Amino acid sequence: MRENPYREDKEELRELIIQYQHLKHGRSHPFLDEDAFERIIDYYDEKDDLPEAMIAAELGLEQFPYSANLMIKKADLLL
């Protein structure tokens, strides 16, 4: 049983953000899956950082160009 799932999720999200920043700046090229990009987009959207959320959506769509979920996330950001 997990001791504190909220804390583990928060730490996992923090690690995803770090990996995303490295990918964005061309440092070490970690693989981020489609779900990771969705979480990153949601993170920046919740922080009201729409330009960064849009960049994350674009990077996600570069790696997963046929992802309906990422297309919908991007469309939601544009509304």
Each PLM stretch: what is its role?
Residues D9-S28, D48-E58:
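Repeat-mediated protein-protein interaction surfaces in helical alpha-solenoids
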